[in-house]
Amino acid sequence: MRLIAAVLICISTSLQASIEAPGLSDREYRYLTLPNALKVLLISDPTTDKAAASMDVFVGTNNDPKEFPGLAHFLEHMLFLGTDQYPEAGEYQQFISDQAGSHNAFTAPEHTNYFFSLNPKALEPALDRFSRFFVAPTLDPAYVDREVNAVHSEYQSKLRDPARLSFEATKQGLNPNHPFSHFGAGNLSTLQKPGLLDALKRFYENEYSANRMALVVLGEEPLDRLEQIVTERFTEIPNRNLPSSIIDRPLFDTNRLPFVVQSKPATESRRLTLLFPVPDTDAFIDRAPLRYIGHLLGHEGEGSLLANLKARGYANGLSAGESLGMTESRSFSISVSLTPEGLTHRDTIIEEILRTIRLIETTGIDAWRFEELKVISDANFKFEEESDPQNVVTYLSEKLHSVPPQNLFTHGRLLEQFDHQLIQDMLSWLTPEQMLVRVTAPEIEPSETTTYYPTQIHRFPLEKNRLDAFQNARKEVSQIVRLPDPNPFIKAPGEPLPKTRKATIETQPRVLFFSEGALGYVLTENRYSQPKSDIYIRLRTPLASNSPEASIMSDLLSDAINEHLNSMSYAAALAGAGFSAQATQSGITLQFSGYHQSLIPLVNQVLDSLPIPLIDESTWSRLQQLKSQSLARVQAARPSSRLFDEITAELMPLAYSQTELNDAFESIDRQTFHQYQKAFFSGFKTEMFLHGPVSRDEGKALLESWVQRLPIDNSTPDIQVTTNPWSGESIRSYQYDHPDQAATVLYIDTNTDPGSRILNQLAGNLIEAPFYTRLRTEKQLGYITFATAFPLYNTPILTGAIQSPTANPDELADAIQNEFEGFAAMVEAMPDDQFESQRLSLLDQLLNPPSTQGELSNAIWSAIGLRRPFSDRMEQVATLESLTKDQFVAYLKQRIQNPVVLKAYHSNG
């Protein structure tokens, strides 16, 4: 069969030179259509640190048979459990893990996507395994019942998920005859039926076909070699010449509109969303009419719709743009995050939205506005860094079904032609007669509960008197909203910088500014060809986290800074110069990233705006509500996540439990916050880092000018960000409002040197796949099952976690500990080449630089904050280079046999 496939290469069709890629891409591309009609995109990148592949099947939950809702999702699970040439369940997962890789899949309404990434040297054997999913999966009956339970466990884990509950409510306002409105996740009641295996095989044979598939492969090999590897393996996929799987029914039943669906949220949040069906715009995507409209409606600058709603105390945020939709059925949405006051005035908000639409129709369709969007789109495309291999193959494999290969990268990205009439036509669809109104709020009084999720809703046709009022508003021009002026931050970013030879590239920042209370680092950008900078400024003070109250107020202060500067920073962000303030345990970090020419003026303006004015009552009320919602979201998170948060908080002296934070929040009023705000800005230490296209002298001058703008106080006590000492074994028990039970076990290494941290990472890489296979696939303890390594600051930790609908916490913890206690023996029995593959893969990651400028900046800033020497990385390289398997087994035995263990249990009572 391989020989036949190789011969068929000559009749494959290919396209190479005309694929337009982002300006900085050094990758080579080739599009093929194999003889079996499989669409293929090959990407050659000799310098990649990961190879990756994604197969997108143009089949999803929309194609489920009525008798078995969730069957497409169930098939996705089953394909991982053995093929004709690799029949052992878990073999594929183990192979990917052994090559320092990752894998996953997802089932969407129209698509099912399978993907992986791993060590580039292992791409060919990985594709050997991956291809058989689509040629000859075993669909082994022995795994059917077990995997139905896995699907059900996944379904149960998301029963309280806020996004899932809201989505379920939205579906109640859509066309009930469109399968998108139906249940697609699958559970015991929809799948555990007679005839499931036959239905599964029938679905695979009737829906999966090469002509419905698209494959993207990225590797270090030349294109000709990639073509040979792919053609030999994937030409064997059967082409059943199936017709298009697109559902030709409309997503919205226009006869039901206008319609209202109200729902109670899982957390304390309030949102108003208007959904309008609109025509498919793919034929004129380069004119971007909906993007243009969304840009004006969602603008956050002074005088904008959002700014006015905030000023009246009605809203916290607003977004607008193309939204819910299928291939041939689209929608446009305007979504407003409401305050309690805004909820009571939601009709007023709807009327003002409709008046703003009319304002755009009459005075807002301008060529210069389109040109602004075009300039920044062109710049972003020109200077886009190479995307993560796994992300790029997953993204492109779905697009291959509907986008000409030469436009894969430009589709929806580059703007070409201003079309006044087209924008006008799209605006004409945004009318109250064709509107689905979604309201989410705790105050809603429900009349029913949806079938598969505990979503409480109330739905009804929009009342005539309200429709009349909305129709009148749609004819009026807003008298309070002002459309944005020309953006002063939009500047031509220049040309790509010349790439520097590796031997001269700087990899460590230089301390170029040091004074009492201030420390500044500069790294000259000469690796990524970017006319961009990353700038970090930390306002360092114990007031950030020396009590639960301080921790809450530090969060509120960073929110207040973002709020006060939003009108300015939003315009800068549109121009590719981003800013945000974020609270940390050591202070508040001001982070800037973007085109250097636009970024430096932004930094100056932000620093000149500090300290911000004391906030007024209206702003305080909104910030309080947002913080309350944030705390509520933490409490609504799944048990496995909450346990991890609780247990890691115990390990950090400057972190606090959820109960402590909730109590602190309740004790803070505006006057207390004002006192905190004044104290914070009375003085602090600072540390800065500039990574960009500047010389050392230029960088030093900038740092000096920024320090002069800040109230530096060298007497401010310094902060040591570290972990609490721990010993022995400890158990913590919690009880949450969730039907599942959970356990998390942490193995804490008391050695914090660089070598111990990298050995911990290697241990996490080695245990991840077997832990998952035994406890998730074989024992079916729970859908959420994982083991991983992570450093908590400089402390190495191994953790295992399971969330289960059936087992109790003691059983889960015992299962986790049994896996870790057998870990050393497992590695000892492991073939030497398997261990070497993991060791060398991790070593390659250390030796290869980060793939983007932002990743390098973040890594350096993290090291600065943790007071890590920049030489740590080379110490870790030395540890791995000399490491033998016997030495690593001895390390594991010492670590696991004399453990420092912290356990956390959640019981549903």
Task: For the regions a language model picked out, list residue spans one by one.
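Mature N-terminal segment immediately following signal peptide/propeptide cleavage
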Residues: 23-54
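Non-catalytic accessory/assembly modules
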Residues: 94, 125-127, 138-179, 190-198, ...
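N-terminal signal peptide c-region/cleavage motif recognized by signal peptidases
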Residues: 11-14
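C-terminal regions of mature proteins
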Residues: 216-219, 369-526, 643-706, 719-726, ...
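M16/insulysin-pitrilysin zinc metalloprotease superfamily fold
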Residues: 81-85, 117-148, 328-385, 542, ...
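M16/MPP (pitrilysin/insulinase) zinc-metallopeptidase core fold and M16-derived inactive scaffolds
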Residues: 47, 52-117, 182-185, 299-317, ...
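Buried hydrophobic packing residues in well-ordered domains
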Residues: 37, 55, 73, 114, ...
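Sec-dependent signal peptide recognition
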Residues: 1-7
